[in-house]
C-alpha cells in the first residue's frame, strides 16, 4: 500500500482544501489514514449510517422491508431525489425508500426514514459501528438549524462503518450484504469511479472488472465519496472527504484517487 499512499498524498498535497482519507485493504489488513479524526460536514454521506439504523430496526423485527410507506405532501423537501415529485398518497415498500435514499440521494426518503427510526437510534447505530467522533442531529433541507449542532463525519468513523459492512459485521451478515447490494446500484458515479473502465464495455483492454458500493456527499465547497471497492477477490474500503476546495478540482482529485485505488487492486489480483 506504500505506493498507493504516496500517489494519493501527491494528489492532495497541492490542494488548498482539507482532506480526510482512510484507505483499508481488507485482504492484507494494511491501512493508511490522513486527517482521519478531522470533522467534516457530513452532507449525504450521513445517509449510510441512517440506512444501517433502518436495517437494525428490521433486524429487531420493529420494521419490515416490505412495509408500505405512504408519501405525504408536508413531508416533501427539495434537493436531490424523485419522491418530492410523486403524487402524495403514493405508497412504496420500505426497501425502495432506502434504495432511493442511497442511489439517488433522495432527501425526502431520508427524512421519512429518520422519522421511522428516530434520531437516538441513528446515533446509537453510529456509536455501535465505531463512529466515535461523528455526530447526527438534523433531518435534511431544514430551514432552521439545530442548536445542538450539525451532522458531521470523520474519515476514521466512516471507514470503521464501511469496514464492518464489508466484513458482514454491520447489523448482521445478511443486512451487510443487502446494504452493499444497494450501494452497488449507486447512480452518482462522478467521483471515485469516474475514471474507471466502463463496466458496460467490451473494450477494456483486458483490465479486471470492478464493482463499487459507494455513497457521495456534496454541497458547494464540500465533496465526499466513500465506499467499498471490489476487484477480483480483492476488497478495499475508501473514505475520501474534502472541504474548502474548488468543486471542479475536488471532483478531479477524487476521480484520480479512485483510479489509483483501482490500479493498486489490479496489481494485486
PLM regions and their residue ranges:
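Structured C-terminal helix/loop/strand segments within mature extracytoplasmic catalytic/sensor domains
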Residues: 1-9, 116, 168-196, 206-209, ...
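Active-site SXXK
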Residues: 29, 41-69, 238
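Mid-domain, small-residue-enriched loop/turn segments at the edges of structured enzyme/sensor domains
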Residues: 15, 112-170
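Conserved catalytic neighborhood of penicillin-recognizing serine enzymes
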Residues: 76-111, 151
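Beta-lactamase-like hydrolase cores
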Residues: 1-38
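Short, glycine/proline-biased beta-turn/loop segments that scaffold the active-site neighborhood
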Residues: 60-86
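Stable alpha-helical elements in mature extracytoplasmic
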Residues: 4-7, 93-97, 109, 113, ...
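Short glycine/serine- and small hydrophobic-enriched flexible loop segments
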Residues: 52-60, 103, 115, 160-167, ...
Amino acid at each position: 500500500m506504500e505506493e498507493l499512499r504516496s500517489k494519493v498524498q501527491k494528489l492532495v498535497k497541492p490542494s488548498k482544501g482539507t482532506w480526510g482519507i482512510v484507505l483499508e485493504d481488507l485482504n492484507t489488513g494494511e491501512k493508511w489514514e490522513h486527517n482521519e479524526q478531522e470533522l467534516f460536514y457530513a452532507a449525504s454521506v450521513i445517509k449510510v449510517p441512517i440506512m444501517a439504523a433502518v436495517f437494525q430496526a428490521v433486524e429487531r423485527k420493529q420494521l419490515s422491508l416490505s412495509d408500505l410507506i405512504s408519501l405525504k405532501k408536508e413531508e416533501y423537501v427539495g434537493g436531490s431525489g424523485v419522491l418530492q415529485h410523486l403524487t402524495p398518497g403514493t405508497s412504496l415498500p420500505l426497501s425502495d425508500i432506502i434504495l432511493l435514499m442511497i442511489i439517488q440521494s433522495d432527501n425526502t426518503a431520508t427524512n421519512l426514514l429518520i422519522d421511522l427510526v428516530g434520531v437516538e437510534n441513528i446515533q446509537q447505530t453510529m456509536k455501535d459501528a465505531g463512529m466515535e467522533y461523528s455526530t447526527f442531529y438534523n433531518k435534511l433541507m431544514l430551514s432552521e438549524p439545530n442548536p445542538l449542532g450539525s451532522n458531521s463525519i470523520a474519515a476514521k468513523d466512516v471507514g470503521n462503518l464501511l469496514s464492518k459492512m464489508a466484513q458482514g459485521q454491520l447489523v448482521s451478515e445478511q443486512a451487510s450484504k443487502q446494504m452493499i447490494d444497494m450501494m452497488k446500484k449507486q447512480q452518482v458515479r462522478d467521483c471515485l469511479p469516474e475514471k474507471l473502465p466502463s463496466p458496460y464495455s467490451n473494450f477494456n483492454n483486458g483490465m479486471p472488472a470492478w464493482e463499487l458500493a459507494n455513497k457521495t456527499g456534496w454541497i458547494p465547497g464540500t465533496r465526499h465519496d466513500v465506499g467499498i471497492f471490489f476487484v477480483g477477490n480483492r476488497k478495499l474500503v475508501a473514505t475520501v472527504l474534502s472541504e474548502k476546495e474548488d468543486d471542479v478540482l475536488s471532483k478531479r482529485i477524487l476521480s484520480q484517487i479512485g483510479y489509483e485505488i483501482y490500479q493498486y487492486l489490479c496489481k494485486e489480483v
